[in-house]
Amino acid sequence: MTKFLGPIAGFGVTFSTMFKKANTEFYPEEKTPTAPRYHGRHQLNRYADGLEKCIGCELCAWACPADAIFVEGADNTDEERYSPGERYGRVYQINYLRCIGCGLCIEACPTRALTMTNEYEMADDNRAGLIYEKDRLLAPLESGMVDSPHPMAPGTTAEDYYRGTVTGGAAPASQDEPEADDTAGDRP
């Protein structure tokens, strides 16, 4: 008897789901918000004055199981300072054809320079377009930030940056550049 009721019970499940309302998502017209901790596109963060947080240590590249990250560090100079430390990431590439979105690179970063955003629309018809360079990964400049290279904020050290005590604002002009004079004689 149970031999005959088994298939009927299976058809009962199928029959009951036939009359349920379909859960249709109207993507891409209506985009549903992602979870706050969603692993989307990577972002290279900046300090409050615009200097880059990446110190070019290459720990993210070593931690990546898919070998999707390439970092080449370089030394900062007093003339060209990209980060508050001795080094910065001169070349930074993430190959999204290889990235598996695991987030191990985020955990490996000692300065929290690398985070993941909620952006997930990265499709491209060109394979080369899915290799993101540093210019596409850097966080956009906010108000009060100055694009690097520029000197550190006056009176601060690299430790002040790492502790988070540096606030936004442009670094003062160097002594080599003359300051603008607001007198009427300077205007054409």
From Swiss-Prot:
Cofactor needs: [4Fe-4S] cluster
Catalytic activity: a quinone + NADH + 5 H(+)(in) = a quinol + NAD(+) + 4 H(+)(out)
Residues at which [4Fe-4S] cluster 1 binds: 54, 57, 60, 109
Biased composition (Acidic residues): 176-188
Chain positions recorded as [4Fe-4S] cluster 2 binding sites: 64, 99, 102, 105
Membrane topology qualifier: Peripheral membrane protein
Keyword 4Fe-4S: yes
Annotated Pfam families: Fer4_7 (PF12838)
Biological processes annotated in GO: aerobic respiration
Assigned EC number: 7.1.1.-
Superkingdom of origin organism: Bacteria
Its job: NDH-1 shuttles electrons from NADH, via FMN and iron-sulfur (Fe-S) centers, to quinones in the respiratory chain. The immediate electron acceptor for the enzyme in this species is believed to be ubiquinone. Couples the redox reaction to proton translocation (for every two electrons transferred, four hydrogen ions are translocated across the cytoplasmic membrane), and thus conserves the redox energy in a proton gradient.
Protein name: NADH-quinone oxidoreductase subunit I
UniProt organism field: Rhodococcus opacus (strain B4)
Top-level taxonomy: Bacteria, Bacillati, Actinomycetota, Actinomycetes, Mycobacteriales
